[in-house]
């Protein structure tokens, strides 16, 4: 019996000071309260960032829609401005009463902002225009190529040199003379002398009874 008691006492030896300290620290640690990390501030920041980003996306989209609408309006305005109005169409043609032009006289009318010469030619002028040698012309054209009715010569009153307006019934050939640089045109409006390279231009026109419609 004594031997057994001795063995038991041997098994339960007193704890050392170091062991007691470790156990005490473990108990204190187990009793201490660990704080759970608070993510509210982070979540709030993320939510604020998401809201800001969503607002930015909304503004970009809205500006895109406004830009598209503005571009569409601009295109529609541009196209509508290109559509010819009644006034513009009226200016595209000009009607002249030929009965009001005396024989051997010129009139000047305005067509699309350009002067148009209309000459009521005499029989002598018609004969003179047809008697010209083509080899003597800088820009060869017969009179028949330049008129629809021999007694009516209709052409643009713009010098083919630099765009000045020639003077009627003047020059060395009894037709038109450009005072800017000295070009002379005959009674058919053909260049005969001076720096102009071409004859006076013939516009599109048609006769309608006693009237002519230019354009």
Curated annotation (Swiss-Prot):
Changing residue 178 to S/Y: Loss of activity. The Rieske protein is a high potential 2Fe-2S protein. This is Cytochrome b-c1 complex subunit Rieske, mitochondrial. Processed by both the mitochondrial processing peptidase (MPP) and the mitochondrial intermediate protease (MIP). Initially, MPP removes 22 amino acids from the newly imported precursor in the mitochondrial matrix. This proteolytic processing is then followed by a second proteolytic cleavage by MIP, which removes an octapeptide to generate mature-sized RIP1. The keyword Cytoplasm does not apply. Component of the ubiquinol-cytochrome c oxidoreductase, a multisubunit transmembrane complex that is part of the mitochondrial electron transport chain which drives oxidative phosphorylation. Residues 123-214 form the Rieske domain. Residues 90-93 are annotated as: Hinge. Gene3D superfamilies: Rieske [2Fe-2S] iron-sulphur domain, Ubiquinol cytochrome reductase, transmembrane domain. Keywords: 2Fe-2S, Disulfide bond, Electron transport, Iron, Iron-sulfur, Membrane, Metal-binding, Mitochondrion, Mitochondrion inner membrane, Respiratory chain, Transit peptide, Translocase, Transmembrane, Transmembrane helix, Transport. Belongs to the Rieske iron-sulfur protein family. Component of the ubiquinol-cytochrome c oxidoreductase (cytochrome b-c1 complex, complex III, CIII), a multisubunit enzyme composed of 10 subunits. The complex is composed of 3 respiratory subunits cytochrome b (COB), cytochrome c1 (CYT1) and Rieske protein (RIP1), 2 core protein subunits COR1 and QCR2, and 5 low-molecular weight protein subunits QCR6, QCR7, QCR8, QCR9 and QCR10.
């Amino acid at each position: 019996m004594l031997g057994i008691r001795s063995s038991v006492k041997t098994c339960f030896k007193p704890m050392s000071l170091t062991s007691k300290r470790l156990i005490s620290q473990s108990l204190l640690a187990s009793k201490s309260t660990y704080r759970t990390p608070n993510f509210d501030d982070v979540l709030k920041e993320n939510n604020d960032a998401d809201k800001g980003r969503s607002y930015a996306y909304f503004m970009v989209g809205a500006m895109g829609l406004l830009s598209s609408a503005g571009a569409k309006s601009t295109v529609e305005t541009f196209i509508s401005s290109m559509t010819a109005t009644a006034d513009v169409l009226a200016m595209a043609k000009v009607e002249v009463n030929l009965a009001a032009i005396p024989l051997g006289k010129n009139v000047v009318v305005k067509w699309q902002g350009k002067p148009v010469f209309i000459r009521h030619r005499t029989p002598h002028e018609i004969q003179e225009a047809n008697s010209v040698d083509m080899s003597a012309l800088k820009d060869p054209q017969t009179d028949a190529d330049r008129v629809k009715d021999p007694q009516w010569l209709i052409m643009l009153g713009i010098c083919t040199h630099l765009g000045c307006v020639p003077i009627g019934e003047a020059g060395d050939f009894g037709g038109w003379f450009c005072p800017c640089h000295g070009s002379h045109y005959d009674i058919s409006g053909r260049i005969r002398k001076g720096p102009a390279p071409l004859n006076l231009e013939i516009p599109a026109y048609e006769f309608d009874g006693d009237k002519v419609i230019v354009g």
